[in-house]
Amino acid sequence: MTNLKEVTFEKPSYDQWQEAAVKQLKGKPFESLLTKTIEGITLEPLYTEERLLEALDGKLEEQVSTVRALKADGDFGVAQQAFGSSIEEFVAQTNDAFARGAQYVTVGKVSFEWDEAALKQLAALIDTHKQVVLYVDNKEVVNVFNFVTDKTVTGFIVSAEPVELTDFANVRTLNAHTQTVHYEGANATQELAIALAQAAELLGEDFAANEDKFFASFAIDPQFFMEIAKIRAFRVLWKAFAQAYGVTSPKPVQIVTETSLRSFSKLDVYVNLLRAGNEAFSAVIGGADVVTVHPHNVLTGPTNQSVRIARNAALVIKEESHVTKVLDPAGGSYFVESLTHDLVKNAWAYFLEIQATGGYTAAQAKIAADVKVVWDKRLADVETRKAVLVGTNNFADATEEVPAESFVDVNRLAQPFEKLRVDFKENPVKVAVLAYGELKKIKPRTDFVTGIFATAGVTADVTEPFTDVEAAKNYLATTDAQVVVFSAVDEDVEAVLPQIIASKQPGTLLDVAGKFDIDGIDGALYAGMNIYEKLEGIQTSLKEVQR
């Protein structure tokens, strides 16, 4: 009898694995397993130690050690924003947050004015709790330091504009602020390069003199592994950046993060919980020093409950995941290390392009143009469902209305579909799906059609499946629906649809489910199409008919 402890298995090579994978693809090319990210990085289906070492030219250990050397420890600070309709409510929320695990007095957008009385109460909070993060939405809030008496408080002033602050040596004010370009559409490569370009201007000629005042801030997207790699890559880039100043051993660089609102939606807002939790976890694993989790309903106005849930998302990661017990928990992952390397290489190249243009300020036109290309690609991916916003461009609830309230206004990918809902509510459209054939065969196409209209807040009426051409003609001739979509299997589309087109009433739009080109129809709904343009086009066409 064979002793299982003595059984050995031959380790297959990458080529052997690839050969086996191709056989399973049943005629599809191996390249179908590759995925290109919006950064232009090609994701492989398998990462191995050998291929990683080859890609890094044997410098894997150097990359890992750099990431770890430039992170002070494995912990992170919970910076949960307080809101409130008054300074008194803001103070109460902040004190409650500290009692429940928050570590920074965190200020962002509020719905009251920062007058002298409010600033004095905020200053008292900072004196009490000793740590502060100011997300500068209103420049007046920076004046709080005129009233802070404890000059040893620590913290960060997160601002797109440089802030001068004397007497507070432990408050960092030189911020490589990438949130602005993030909301303009920038990808991870661009954010990293722009952070370096900003750092070059902020630090000037004397790296050592300004190092203790510098930090970088990033908004973290839902692309889990890419965002982990983004934070790690910045530390590798920071070492190279410091070496350009002749500093071989820079101090750990501080990184402040906030969950991104770029993928947030006013629709199906509880999905924002998942987005924010995912983003927060990737920030922590990537090595963020400070994490702010935005409430799921921050777009329309946060509540005490949503603020508590957001804070608890960070606290659960901090207290229950144990990732803070490890320095650089993602280190050594072939996939993450490969992504980190690709981002470092590409971001440094783009940084040099910016510097060749004259630096960050001089390169504003170039940066804006480059970032717009990426934003347009992001929008196109959402509008064609290549990228899915659950509850917004797919799996949407047709009965949900877009809240009119607006508390935070940033560039978001969901906005076109939110606008569609408003348009279709103001100009209602009756849509019917003319089902033809056996139900179980046509249901996938029918559901696809109803799902598309649901993204605009339209509940499409689906007929009982017809099996008789004359009955289908009669329905088309008598329906009060303004838009009718014919849904059937391919054979029935080609055989039946041409026979019933003539029965269409004037002013009725007749479309087909599936990518067909048939004379007499107004259009088609199919996978991969730009559903936003299609739905917007329906509105435009019906308005023209009404005129």
Enumerate the language-model features and the residues they cover.
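Generic hydrophobic alpha-helical scaffold/packing signal
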Residues: 314, 337-340, 344, 351, ...
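A short beta-alpha structural unit
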Residues: 298, 333-338, 433-439, 472
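Active-site lining segments that contact anionic ligands and/or coordinate catalytic metals
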Residues: 213, 250-252, 288-290, 348-351, ...
